[in-house]
Amino acid sequence: MKKQALFCMVLAGTLMVGGCGQKAADSTTATAQVTETSDSAPADKPDGAPGDNSEKPGNPPDGAPGSMDGKQAPPDGGNGGPGGPGGQSAAPTSYKAVSSYSTDTEEDGKTYTSTGADESAVLITDGAKVTLKNFTMDRNSADSTGGDNSSFYGTGAAALATNGSLTLTGGTITTDAKGGAGVFSYGDGKVTVSDTTITTKQDTSGGIHVAGGGTLTASNLTVETNGESSAAIRSDRGGGTMTVDGGTYTSRGTGSPAVYCTADITVNNAALTAENSEAVCIEGLNSLSLTNCSLSGNIPENEQNDCDWTVILYQSMSGDSEVGESKFSMDGGSKPTPHGTS
């Protein structure tokens, strides 16, 4: 495999891996800092599309970077939560949804279907507390655009909470649309999802996703994503908090890690698999903690790939995360293979 230098202004990470595989080991820590001078042409970012020296670096492994002249950020205009860049914001002024909830509601055994462009099946606003049980949720649209609005703000996600709490239990979520995340928590949204199967088929369609400071708690999920830039456990600008316990999380698309972290994410007792990407990517001032998790990644051997590590910590200049030290810890579970952590 052709190896290239990872392009970044500053890359700093703290790594803690202990008790991996069948043979337990004492936890170790390491800190790495890399600075590349401006007189060498930047190499592509992990799993990004390559370019010649006249082109901008490729995209990060999950989610497209915003344009540097646009500088999109969470709508409060501040630094956002962990992983939130500074700068101004261009969040949507409204969202489209088939079923929009602004008052407290509980429903059981219903089906929610969305076929419109960049439209959600379920949307939670105005501080509503909504519980959906034993549900079926389908999101299908050939006209959806995906892109930054889907990655940063949740546009077109099957289930989206922007202000209020959403509890999902015992359901099935399927999306076949660009930008069709399974479950998305943004801003003042709080999502709890359990005992649910989530399948996404198109690009920019994470399984469970937080951004803009959202909060999401997941337990015993079966998640499969198939598109590019579609991590099974995904976060983006503005970060947030995600806690995952149990379940299987599989990403099959190119440039789609099992976990893409621009937030504070904790995962316990889960199986994490990326079939065409590094298993874990942590960007900037953010953290990922794994306990008793199996971890598997697989980067195809071709000259477009910068590295073949299972776990990568890096800093891009896209503005998708605040510049700072990435933190990764792994206690128990299976050892990252074949090459560990970069």
What are the residue ranges of the model-derived segments?
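Positively charged n-region of N-terminal signal peptides that target proteins for export
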Residues: M1-L11
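C-terminal motif of bacterial Sec signal peptides marking the signal peptidase cleavage site
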Residues: L15-G19
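A detector of tandemly repeated sequence units and domain arrays
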Residues: A41, K45, A49, K56-P60, ...
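Acidic/polar low-complexity surface segments
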Residues: P65, P74-A91, T136-T162, G180-G187, ...
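N-terminal segments that cap or nucleate solenoid repeat domains
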Residues: G83-S144
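All-beta strand scaffolds that present successive hydrophobic residues in beta-strands
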Residues: D104-G109, K129-F135, L166-G170, K190-T196, ...
